[in-house]
Amino acid sequence: MDIGDVIQDLERIAPPDRAEEMDTGRIGLIIEGRRDIRKVACALDVTLPVVRAAAAMDAGLLVVHHTPLWTPVTAVSGPLAALLRQILSADLNVYVMHTNFDHAEGGINDALASLLELSGTGRMSLGICGDCPLTLPEIARRLSAPLITWGRPSLPCRIGVVGGSGFDLPLIEEAAALGAEAFLSADLKHAQARASPLPLLQSTHYALESPGMRMLAGRMGWEFIDDPPVTAVWT
């Protein structure tokens, strides 16, 4: 299939106009490779192990959630040079769907809600609120990642969930207005924890967003490449 036809399909899945302003210039086809696409790989991040795995399976396209070119590039050296060299030598296209896939039907947050078996759901401006039947240990097992809590959440209960860095006070307040008794996201800061009107559940960024890319790959018949960071909790 021609890359142009594939891009049309991708834009139907995650319409570019649903992306937030911060993603201007950071989504879509950010690295061009071959025109003829016979195999598609999918991952959360563009890392060297991911690119090597995509090249080994002779994928023509890598669909990811996070761009490897977030900040303006003023020099191509070190790890970035090594990454781009691997991508270009594999003639690999890289396509990014970020906040447009966060907001999309069947996207990052829908996949997270499905994984946690949320029911009676309501959409927030970003994320989903719903009744969660799982206990804290069960949530940690579903996510395959450590779970840290602030406050005293009592699960099962109604929770708000936002994949990625979602601990913004307006989002937490929005979840509370929808009846949430706890809030799950990643990358919590001290001031956010102190200001929150709800008990908070923190997992890793990867654990909350990779299910969406994995489910997308399964739906589309792509190869999902798993490359989780190594995490541990010491007490």
Language model regions located:
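Active-site catalytic microenvironments in core metabolic enzymes, especially phosphate/sugar-handling
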Residues: 1-235
